[in-house]
A protein has these predicted regions:
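Generic recognition of well-ordered alpha-helical segments
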Residues: 13, 31-34
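Alpha-helix boundary/capping residues
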Residues: 18, 33-36
């Protein structure tokens, strides 16, 4: 079970940018966050563990171009990205 949900500064910037850009995508992001809090590393959005410099992080598809990148650490969800492709962490 997930306790707290937090965003890195970049993750929050991505999230807030969807508020003014695309409410439909924002709704999908919220649905993914809800599913992550319930199911962790399984569920909708094709969960995938990331490798190399993103080892320990997972991604889920928001749409064909965008991904939500996150990790669960000590029962807390940290969202590092809600946008296009993977940035170096």
């Amino acid at each position: 079970m997930i306790g707290n949900i937090s965003f890195t500064p970049d993750g929050w910037e991505d999230y807030v940018s969807w508020l003014g850009e695309d409410k439909r995508t924002l709704k999908k992001i919220l649905k993914l966050i809800e599913d992550i809090t319930r199911n962790g590393y399984t569920g909708i959005g094709h969960p995938e563990p990331l490798k190399d410099n993103l080892s320990g992080y997972w991604s889920r598809e928001i749409d064909d171009k965008n991904r939500i990148v996150f990790r669960v650490d000590e029962g807390n969800l940290e969202i590092t990205q809600c946008g296009s492709h993977y940035r170096d962490k």
